Amino acid sequence: MNPLTKVKLINELNEREVQLGVADKVSWHSEYKDSAWIFLGGLPYELTEGDIICVFSQYGEIVNINLVRDKKTGKSKGFCFLCYEDQRSTILAVDNFNGIKIKGRTIRVDHVSNYRAPKDSEEIDDVTRQLQEKGCGARTPSPSLSESSEDEKPTKKHKKDKKEKKKKKKEKEKADREVQAEQPSSSSPRRKTVKEKDDTGPKKHSSKNSERAQKSEPREGQKLPKSRTAYSGGAEDLERELKKEKPKHEHKSSSRREAREEKTRIRDRGRSSDAHSSWYNGRSEGRSYRSRSRSRDKSHRHKRARRSRERESSNPSDRWRH
């Protein structure tokens, strides 16, 4: 069968499995689960083992390689065999590298069920023998050696942790001693500042209360005359307004005292205003009475003068007699 047709058939199989969602156990790759070798065909003749490892090591670590060469000339025949460390990398290599092109040549990749190393002849070099026997992959350490090295590492780490903890404890003790030595010297000025703050606190509070009381008094004084004009006899309404104007933060006792004082002030002012109005009314009445009496006297005098003139005009003979 033509190698290109084999490439097409393998790709068609992979596509069908992907479309149908076939499980790994039922896949055609499961037939080669015991072999980690793959076959590479159609390689360019110029490629060496190193070039092949660089290309095909993308999906796993390569442990062994066998590039078939001509015994006389030493040139490659265009195909080789690869061995991966993990068998699952062979599945990835067959699915992805099958049908790729390197230097214009399509490459065929397929599984190998039972790979047998070629019979060694006397002409083979020592290097090729070592490669075929030991492989070209990195050696993994044995489990016993790895466990012993892991046991040694925690012991070393534990010792280092103990030393670091001791150093940290010493540093903390030194820092605590320095802080304790600094505390008595620094505590005295702090206490003084706290006392000064406590002393200034009530002073500020009292000054604020006095300022608020002073502000409330002129406001009350400004609003009193308006209340007089609006309410002639409304002492009770004034008291209500004054109670509303008082701040909420004042105590009940102080508010009651101020209300009583304001009541007495309002009463005194009402009395003085009544007396002033009565005095003014009496004075105006006296003036009107006087003006009336004066007008009466003037009219009476004019009448007398007229009468006397009439008498004189009526009796001129009496004047000459006298």
From Swiss-Prot:
- Keyword Nucleus in record: yes
Pfam name, any one: RRM_1
Q: What is its main location?
A: nucleus
Q: Which UniProt keywords apply?
A: Isopeptide bond, mRNA processing, mRNA splicing, Nucleus, Phosphoprotein, RNA-binding, Spliceosome, Ubl conjugation
Ion transport among the record's keywords? no
Gene Ontology MF terms in the entry: RNA binding
Which positions bear Phosphothreonine?
T140
Q: Which domain of life is it from?
A: Eukaryota
RRM domain mapped to chain residues: 36-114
Chain positions with Phosphoserine modification: S149, S186, S188, S232, S272, S314
Per UniProt, the ranges with Basic residues bias are 155-171, 289-308
Glycyl lysine isopeptide (Lys-Gly) (interchain with G-Cter in SUMO2) crosslink location in chain: K8, K243
GO CC, one annotated term: nucleus
Location(s), subcellular: Nucleus
According to its UniProt entry, the function of this protein is described as: Involved in pre-mRNA splicing as component of the activated spliceosome. As a component of the minor spliceosome, involved in the splicing of U12-type introns in pre-mRNAs.
Report the sequence similarity comment from the record. Belongs to the IST3 family.
Subunit organization? Part of the activated spliceosome B/catalytic step 1 spliceosome, one of the forms of the spliceosome which has a well-formed active site but still cannot catalyze the branching reaction and is composed of at least 52 proteins, the U2, U5 and U6 snRNAs and the pre-mRNA. Component of the minor spliceosome, which splices U12-type introns.
**The protein's name:** RNA-binding motif protein, X-linked 2
Q: Which organism is it from?
A: Homo sapiens (Human)
Name of the gene: RBMX2
